[in-house]
UniProtKB/Swiss-Prot annotation:
This is phospholipase A2 inhibitor and Ly6/PLAUR domain-containing protein. Pfam families: PLA2_inh, UPAR_LY6. Disulfide bonds join 29-53, 32-39, 46-74, 80-101, 102-107, 126-152, 145-173. It comes from Mus musculus. One of its GO terms (cellular component) is extracellular region. Its main location: secreted.
């Protein structure tokens, strides 16, 4: 605890010196990941190009296995979205998240409220598929959109889990906020880092006989 306090005091003093001298010193963020609605870790200096801190809490289901996780790290501000995002591929494969992005030292040391997980179908549908180890995804199934999901997404690229890198592609329903994600972005989740080569996001078509 004493060493942690000394380290934090040093970082604060270093940041103040950088500000006074106009040196443009790198950002420092809390870095951690873990199960539950919060996590705590060490303050780390962000690498070049990463100019934001993020804290993200997510609730996900993978083939029906549910989990709640929290992630804190450095990332590029242009890739960071503050707020709620929901995606659904199948009734048992989905993720909802709430995130906060900020640009001052240690600004992600707190927590964010857990996302509201409304699984009520809203009548919209999107092409759906999950294709690990693949670059494309046919979308021959249909995802039933829930809650505030009004858009269809098609994301593809590479995913990193620790030292493992592999291809992935997926399609399904999403909230409009998912459209913030663009091709070329690095998108974090609790235990994975996605490098997107494709990030399509379009309004979901209304079913026949149903107008806007």
């Amino acid at each position: 605890m004493i060493l942690f306090r000394r380290h934090r005091t040093f970082l604060l003093a270093f940041t103040l010196l950088c500000t006074l001298l106009g040196l443009g010193c790198p950002l420092t963020c809390e870095v951690c990941k873990g199960s539950g609605h919060t996590c705590s870790g060490k303050m780390k200096t962000c690498e070049d190009g990463k100019d934001a801190c993020v804290v993200l809490v997510s609730e996900s289901s993978t083939k029906g296995r549910k989990s709640v996780n929290t992630f804190k790290a450095c990332m590029k501000y242009k890739d960071c979205y503050s707020g709620f995002v929901s995606t659904t591929m199948t009734p048992s494969d989905y993720m909802v998240s709430n995130a906060h992005c900020c640009q001052s030292d240690g600004c992600n040391s707190g927590s964010v409220p857990p996302p509201l997980n409304n699984r009520t179908e809203n009548g919209l549908m999107c092409p759906s598929c999950i294709a690990p180890f693949q670059e494309t995804c046919p979308g021959t199934q249909a995802a039933r959109c829930v809650g505030r999901e009004t858009h269809c997404i098609y994301f593809a690229g590479n995913v990193q889990a620790g030292i493992i890198h592999t291809k992935f592609a997926t399609r399904g329903c999403a909230t409009e906020s998912a459209c913030h994600t663009k091709a070329g972005a690095e998108v974090p989740s609790a235990f994975y880092l996605y490098f997107l080569r494709r990030a399509d996001c379009l309004p979901a078509p209304y079913p026949p006989g149903r107008g806007e």
